[in-house]
Structures are given as structure tokens and as C-alpha cells.
């Protein structure tokens, strides 16, 4: 099974599926359709039933029940796209057997080294088989590790009919990294009572709390005049943008917060004297504090509009997703079973809030409670991304154990 999961993961990682937030299609990039078609073929080859891919690239399949018991249908999901933060083209995964705990030279020519001195958690993987990048791309363990784990678990269950289980649905979705994963997901067609995204990080992670999330775009408009005769005439849009940013709490940024602490994240700033645009991510686990953050940003904009004129500054805020805890707590069985599965396997559950979101954040509000489970990856979205194959195997066993527990509890 170890060789199978390595081969699966590498074959997926080599397909460029980076999503594109500027695209209006679904999926946002053609590479995701290439991977989707691969997955359809593989699902059919291992014996899954009702394998479908719709016009938007959503892949679904069924593992039929093999018992007469009435068992709730559960689902497992992973996303096909990779992050926009770093290139996902021409990924060259490197497999390191029995990692020795020392520096890993990812790329000798470019002097790119993955070091436990810079990433202390790496030392904890001594003795593991790990997969890294070659230092020039991201790896795509987020979330192709999840795809490989779901596929391997389904393959195992099909090969072992003596393991009794209810109906299991799987889905592979596009465009999670740009926040559109569930936009065209057909919850009624998926037809599961509960689901799990395999989209987490290190071993043991179970997550059922996400941020409340919004994005803000602020456009500052100036008047450009020759610097030599600008007095009393020039209005510098870039300077307005700097003033605006300076009014936000300096200790409430991504670099200064952790755990349940929310933040304002200036994700991009572009412009000049004539026009400058700021883009922010607004995040908080608490709904009231989330609303306060949006209101505070609006208040700052209004304050500056009084100084520079209402037409000089425009603010657009869009809600993206909400904390799935509000939808999962009423049905905590879905979390309890995942926790029990880990304990049965001798894995210590690590239940933490997600400082981000998953497809499950939105799916939970669409009527499908969907907590998140670890995949074994680290350092997502960059050249130092890696995944432990040993912990990928633990994730496979976790899926199998969850399926078994639903049958046993029926």
C-alpha cells in the first residue's frame, strides 16, 4: 500500500492544477480538468460505482454498502487545485526514504535547503519516508495527499469485502484555494449525511472550527500633478493608502496572531499617485468580533473620506465563508467518530481551530456538516512543502476506521 500511495501522489502532483482567481470559468484552470479525468479513470479502475464528472469538473463516486444494516451515508472530499502563492508547474517530487533528521538539499544548483534549523518540526520526521519538492515549485500535498489517501482507502475497502461498511461517497473538487470549491457542488447529488475533508496538516489533526472570513478591496484615487508644481494640487493615492493602513491595529496581523486571534491581512497593495488599491483578508473565529472588524475598516474609510472626499476612497467588502463550528456542534457525532477512530489507531487527536478555511466551511452551511482531517503535510503553499508518507498511511487507516465505526454504531 505504501508504494501505491507514493505512486498515486506523484502522478497527481505532476499535473499542474494551480487555480486562478482572475478566471471566471469553473474550474478556473484547464489542468484541473486533466486531473479530474485521470481520477475518473482511476475510480472506475479500482471498482468504484456511480463515477461521474460534471461540466464544472466536480468528480463524485460511490462505494456501495455491503451490509443490510441501515447506516448513514458518509463522504470524503479533497480538492484538486493547488495554491496561487507559488508555481505548481513542472513539479518534481523527491522521495527520501528513512529521513536522517539532517538538512535536505532540495536543489544543489540553486542552494535551496530544507533545514530543521529553519523548520524545527522537520526533525520529528526522522525515520519517515518523506516527499519534498526540488525547491523550484510547491509540492501540492495540499491537497493531492488527500486525494491519494481517499483513493487508497477506497481501493483497500473494495479489496477487503470482509470489512463491513455502509454507503460511502467521495468527491474531488476544483478551486478550493480561491474560495470557490463548493460554489457549484451539488449537495443533494452527493447525498451524504456527514462528510470529511481530507485537507489538514500534521498527524492527528481534526478541525471543526474555521474562521469567519471576508475580503476587502479599498481603492484610493488621487490627482497627479508635476512634483515641481504640486503644492495644493496633488492628491497622492499611495499616501492615502499608507495612512489608511496605519490606522489598523499593528498587532492584529497574521504575523502577530495565533490560535483564536483574528487579524487584518494586507494581501496586496498596488498603485501609484493616481490610484492605489489595497486588498485585505479579514478573519476571526468569533462572529461578533468578525462583524466588528468589518465595521472598523468601514469606519476608518469613512474617517478618511471626510478628510479627502467621499469619491477619493471606495470600499468593497465581501463575505467568503463562516465558522463551521456553528453547524457542526449540533451534530458532534461526526467529530466524535473521527476522534474515536484516531484513538483506536493509537493516534493522539489534536483538535485545533483552523486558521483558514476548507471546503467544509461552506459545505457545512449548505447542509453537509464537514469537519477536516489531517493528511500528513507541512509547509503548504511554498517551495519547502513536504509530506510524510508514513502519516499519509495513518490518514488512509483513519478513513478506513471511520467507515468501520459508522457500521459498528449502526
Curated annotation (Swiss-Prot):
GO terms for molecular function: metallopeptidase activity; tripeptide aminopeptidase activity; zinc ion binding. Keywords: Aminopeptidase, Cytoplasm, Hydrolase, Metal-binding, Metalloprotease, Protease, Zinc. It catalyses: Release of the N-terminal residue from a tripeptide. One of its GO terms (biological process) is proteolysis. The active site is at residues 81, 176. Binds 2 Zn(2+) ions per subunit. The keyword Protein biosynthesis does not apply. Its cofactor is Zn(2+). It comes from the Bacteria. Belongs to the peptidase M20B family. PANTHER family: PEPTIDASE T. Cleaves the N-terminal amino acid of tripeptides. This is Peptidase T. It comes from Brevibacillus brevis (strain 47 / JCM 6285 / NBRC 100599). The lineage of its organism: Bacteria, Bacillati, Bacillota, Bacilli, Bacillales. The gene is pepT.
Amino acid at each position: 500500500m505504501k508504494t501505491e500511495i507514493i505512486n498515486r501522489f506523484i502522478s497527481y502532483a505532476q499535473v499542474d492544477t494551480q487555480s486562478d482567481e482572475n478566471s471566471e470559468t469553473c474550474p478556473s484552470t484547464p489542468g484541473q480538468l486533466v486531473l479530474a479525468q485521470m481520477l475518473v479513470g482511476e475510480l472506475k479502475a479500482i471498482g468504484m460505482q456511480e463515477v461521474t464528472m460534471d461540466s464544472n469538473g466536480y468528480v463524485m463516486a460511490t462505494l456501495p454498502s455491503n451490509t443490510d444494516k441501515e447506516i448513514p451515508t458518509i463522504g470524503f472530499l479533497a480538492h484538486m487545485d493547488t495554491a496561487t502563492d507559488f508555481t505548481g508547474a513542472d513539479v518534481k517530487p523527491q522521495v527520501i526514504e528513512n529521513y536522517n533528521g539532517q538538512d535536505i538539499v532540495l536543489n544543489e544548483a540553486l542552494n535551496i535547503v530544507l533545514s530543521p534549523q529553519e523548520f524545527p518540526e522537520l526533525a520529528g520526521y526522522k525515520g519517515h519516508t518523506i516527499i519534498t519538492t526540488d525547491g523550484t515549485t510547491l509540492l501540492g500535498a495540499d491537497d493531492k495527499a488527500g486525494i491519494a489517501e481517499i483513493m487508497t482507502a477506497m481501493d483497500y475497502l473494495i479489496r477487503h469485502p470482509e470489512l463491513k461498511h455502509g454507503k460511502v461517497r467521495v468527491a474531488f473538487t476544483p478551486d478550493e484555494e480561491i474560495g470557490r470549491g463548493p460554489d457549484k457542488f451539488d449537495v443533494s447529488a452527493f447525498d451524504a449525511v456527514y462528510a470529511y475533508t481530507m485537507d489538514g496538516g500534521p498527524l492527528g489533526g481534526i478541525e471543526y472550527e474555521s474562521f469567519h472570513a471576508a475580503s476587502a478591496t479599498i481603492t484610493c484615487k488621487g490627482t497627479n500633478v508635476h512634483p515641481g508644481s504640486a503644492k495644493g494640487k496633488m492628491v497622492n493615492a499611495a499616501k492615502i493608502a499608507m495612512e489608511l493602513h496605519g490606522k489598523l491595529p499593528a498587532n492584529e496581523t497574521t504575523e502577530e496572531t495565533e490560535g483564536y486571534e483574528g487579524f487584518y491581512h494586507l494581501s496586496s497593495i498596488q498603485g501609484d499617485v493616481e490610484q492605489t488599491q489595497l486588498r485585505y483578508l479579514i478573519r476571526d473565529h468569533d462572529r461578533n468580533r468578525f462583524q466588528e472588524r468589518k465595521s472598523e475598516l468601514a469606519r476608518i474609510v469613512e474617517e478618511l473620506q471626510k478628510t479627502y472626499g467621499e469619491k477619493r476612497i471606495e470600499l468593497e467588502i465581501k463575505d467568503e465563508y463562516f465558522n463551521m463550528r456553528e453547524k457542526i456542534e449540533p451534530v458532534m457525532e461526526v467529530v466524535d467518530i473521527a476522534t474515536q477512530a484516531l484513538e483506536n489507531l493509537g493516534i493522539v487527536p489534536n483538535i485545533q481551530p483552523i486558521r483558514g478555511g476548507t471546503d467544509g466551511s461552506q459545505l457545512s452551511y449548505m447542509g453537509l456538516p464537514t469537519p477536516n482531517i489531517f493528511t500528513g503535510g507541512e509547509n503548504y503553499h511554498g517551495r519547502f512543502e513536504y509530506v510524510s508518507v508514513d502519516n499519509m498511511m495513518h490518514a488512509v487507516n483513519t478513513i478506513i476506521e471511520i467507515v468501520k465505526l459508522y457500521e459498528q454504531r449502526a
